[in-house]
Amino acid sequence: MNQEELFDVTVIGGGPAGLYSAFYSGLREMKTKIIEFQPQLGGKIHVYPEKMIWDIGGLLPVTGEKLIEQLVQQGLTFQPEVVLNTKIESIIRNQDGIFTLKTSSGEEHFSKTVIVATGSGILNPQKLSIEGAERFEVSNLNYTVKSLKRFKDKTVIISGGGNSAIDWANELEPIAKKVYLTYRKEELSGHEAQVKQLMNSSAECFFNTSITKLIAGDNHEAIEYVELTNHETGEVSHLSIDEVIINHGYERDITLLENSELDVAIVDNYYIAGNANSESSVDGLYAAGDILKHDGKLHLIAGAFQDAGNAVNKAKQFIQPDASEYGMVSSHNEVFKKRNRELIKQMMK
């Protein structure tokens, strides 16, 4: 390892927490790297690009897609090194205190500190467990909603009873011809307000019921009917549909922490047990965003930004113990003087 390969901060994860960590560590003049498993930055927000996000202070309602664009632009302000399509499988600490991050392809990355910002983990949607279902993924079997327009004036059935399924049912109900929701249990498990909205809408719900068969049309390329089975009565029915959406949750890949030789405290079999300063049980290793769990945690995107700032501040002091506890606010920070002048010139045109 040479000094060019050694970074002050390596952020694992390129979602909101990871991107803000990169921005703030650049603000604090640290050499920064982002490593992201997906082929693009943005994290889980890519799952809902057309959903409106209201709960970020000072930011007017914005689509997920637009928020990603802004987060990426901000996160790259100080030109961190970005490594995409790369899965970190383990973290070890060398005798000199430097962290070595090993990838699934055998590559190694070296860093003085690490911020884990992997959100809910590497997420893979749980597929519909019906033989032959995968062949319809190229036509009308969906595991996410990338465009609301696709479902305009269509008859749609959604399978699932959690927040994602309920949210999409509420989003699509005003624009689809008809929305059905089927759930294997007796009661929905989403947020109370969202459930109430759904039950007061024109959407039709089937409880204790699952999709048990997908029936293709004459062209054998798309689903034309779904078979529904009620688990209590055994009754079987068929619905004519245009689109099927499956929201059965996600399978988490947690090999990163399972393979780590570090004694990282974990809660609920996944989350990093930390504190309000984003510190973990391992000195020099911090967490930000959904992966971090502690009393008083704010489970919003805005909370991820606070986690990120705290993690960076602690990383800065870990590397440089006499450094200021906090970074200078942007309105008085020397690093922005030139940029501010350029922005003001543009505003005056």
Swiss-Prot record:
FAD binds at residues 36, 44, 48, 88, 123, 290, 331. Its EC number is 1.18.1.2. One of its GO terms (molecular function) is ferredoxin-NADP+ reductase activity. Binds 1 FAD per subunit. It catalyses: 2 reduced [2Fe-2S]-[ferredoxin] + NADP(+) + H(+) = 2 oxidized [2Fe-2S]-[ferredoxin] + NADPH. Its cofactor is FAD. Keywords: FAD, Flavoprotein, NADP, Oxidoreductase. It is an enzyme of class 1 (oxidoreductase). Belongs to the ferredoxin--NADP reductase type 2 family. Homodimer. This is Ferredoxin--NADP reductase 1.
